[in-house]
């Protein structure tokens, strides 16, 4: 049986794969496991703007309250806001209903511990055991006054906005910022932060209707933002994903600045301030080779993990690093928050611009992207981890690994959140890489479709 939890919580198509029944059982199990040593635990619950969010919230909260826990609802806020607010309100755990960058039919449920960190695999496994096997036989379901109660926290948005603003001492007067809020969880807080810091703000994709989240907008579709920054003559643009834990930036020329480039410029900024602990950045095996080259040139070490911001965070916590992330835009700044926070990252990027008195193009220019080609093979979700067991696929991978051995690299991996196998090649010839990536991806699709 496939593991219920992926790299970013439980995710699936809402109302079928992620049903209300499953959400209810996740509520019960998480409240029991995450706060088993507390008499009446408190679980903070937030969500993004998806239509299915309120439905799943009701089911999750019912499960939480059914085991005697208290649910505190903060409604629509970014995922990193829940991590912070769980700590601020001293809750025993936090829960977020969101499918991040995925399209509207998907939703997900992920959890934070009382310190605002994503759960380790072992804790997720304990929750999954209860979801699939039921509550422990010695657990007595509460009745009467022992049943839990949901309450709404009205000032959570204000508290998170103030927290983000407190991460900088820089004013943004005279700067023009363009925001793409992905019709998602940042639609209210992002413009508040930048306006209150003094910037002129042009905000787009900030009118969610429950069905338009990530719809040709946000960090996975930044093309329009690039055009807008050029058309408006703005200083910088920022695109968030549906739950605002990712960020893509756009410089004053309308050029996209991805997560690797953001990490490179922030690494140098932190090093200059004496704040880059152990002079090290944590990235993943999918990071561009240009990041390695740039960091080596400036005397900064780089550690690599498997793909997934949870694994980046684990490495950072284990070895005491403060900066890490992924090319996709998850950037973790442990001096400020316990998870990737797109809004805080954006504030740090623009703060670095102000302090250095340089445009973003100059700061991000510290790293030159190596040519890279990527393609996602759409496969049966139950078969996506079997690509390295299929003889035809293994043979093609071996052939390409040999081809790129001395001039680049090949990475093939199953997505932790979608029914896809991701293929990436780095090398000197873009057209040749595009052909090879496409050929391997189509072979994987043919072999691993249902």
Residues of each region from the PLM?
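Short glycine-rich phosphate-binding loop at a beta-alpha junction
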Residues: 40-48, 72, 176-178, 279-285, ...
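Phosphate-binding and adjacent anionic-ligand microenvironments
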Residues: 236, 273-450
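An N-terminal, well-structured beta->alpha segment
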Residues: 1-62, 66-67, 93, 150-177, ...
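Proline/glycine-rich low-complexity loops and linkers
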Residues: 125-161, 166, 252-325, 332-333
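Gly/Ser/Thr-enriched, mixed-charge loops and adjacent short helices
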Residues: 13, 107-232
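N-terminal small/polar loop signature for handling phosphorylated ligands or for N-terminal nucleophile
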Residues: 32, 36-106, 192-250, 399
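Short glycine-centered, acidic/aromatic-flanked micro-motifs in structured strand/loop junctions
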Residues: 46-47, 179-181, 251, 335, ...
């Amino acid at each position: 049986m496939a593991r219920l939890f992926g790299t970013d919580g439980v995710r699936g198509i809402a109302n079928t794969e992620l049903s209300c029944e499953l959400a209810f059982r996740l509520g019960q199990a998480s409240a029991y496991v995450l706060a088993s040593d507390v008499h009446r635990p408190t679980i903070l619950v937030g969500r993004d703007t998806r239509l299915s969010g309120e439905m799943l919230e009701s089911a999750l909260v019912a499960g939480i309250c059914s085991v005697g826990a208290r649910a505190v609802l903060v409604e629509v806020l970014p995922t990193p806001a829940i991590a912070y607010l769980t700590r601020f309100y001293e809750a025993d755990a936090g829960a977020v209903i969101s499918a991040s960058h995925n399209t509207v039919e998907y939703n997900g449920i992920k959890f934070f511990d009382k310190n605002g960190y994503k759960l380790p695999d072992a804790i997720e496994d304990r929750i999954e055991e209860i979801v699939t096997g039921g509550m422990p036989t010695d657990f007595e379901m509460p009745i009467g006054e022992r049943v839990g109660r949901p309450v709404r926290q009205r000032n959570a948005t204000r508290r998170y906005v103030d927290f983000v603003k407190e991460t900088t001492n820089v004013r943004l007067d005279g700067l023009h910022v363009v925001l793409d809020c992905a019709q998602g969880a940042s639609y209210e807080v992002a413009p508040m932060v930048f306006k209150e810091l003094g910037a002129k703000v042009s905000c787009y994709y900030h009118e969610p209707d429950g069905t338009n989240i990530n719809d040709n907008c946000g960090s996975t579709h930044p093309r329009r933002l690039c055009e807008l920054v050029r058309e408006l003559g703005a200083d910088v643009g920022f695109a968030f994903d549906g739950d605002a834990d990712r960020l893509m930036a756009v410089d004053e020329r309308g050029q996209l600045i991805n997560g690797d480039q953001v990490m490179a410029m922030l690494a140098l900024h932190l090093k200059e301030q004496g704040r880059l602990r152990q002079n090290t950045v944590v990235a993943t095996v999918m990071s561009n080779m240009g990041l390695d080259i740039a960091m080596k040139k400036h005397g900064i070490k780089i550690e690599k993990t498997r793909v997934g911001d949870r694994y980046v965070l684990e490495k950072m916590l284990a070895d005491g690093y403060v900066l890490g992330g992924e090319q996709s835009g998850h950037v973790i700044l442990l001096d400020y928050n316990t998870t990737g926070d797109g809004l805080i990252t954006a504030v740090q990027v623009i703060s670095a611009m102000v302090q250095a008195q340089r445009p973003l193009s100059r700061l991000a220019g510290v790293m030159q992207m190596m040519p890279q080609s990527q393609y996602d093979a759409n496969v049966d979700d139950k078969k996506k981890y079997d690509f390295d067991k299929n003889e035809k696929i293994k043979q093609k991978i071996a052939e390409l690994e040999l081809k790129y051995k001395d001039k680049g690299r090949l990475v093939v991996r199953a997505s932790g959140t979608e029914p896809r196998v991701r293929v990436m090649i780095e090398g000197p010839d873009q057209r040749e890489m595009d052909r090879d990536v496409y050929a391997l991806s189509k072979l994987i699709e043919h072999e691993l479709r249902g």
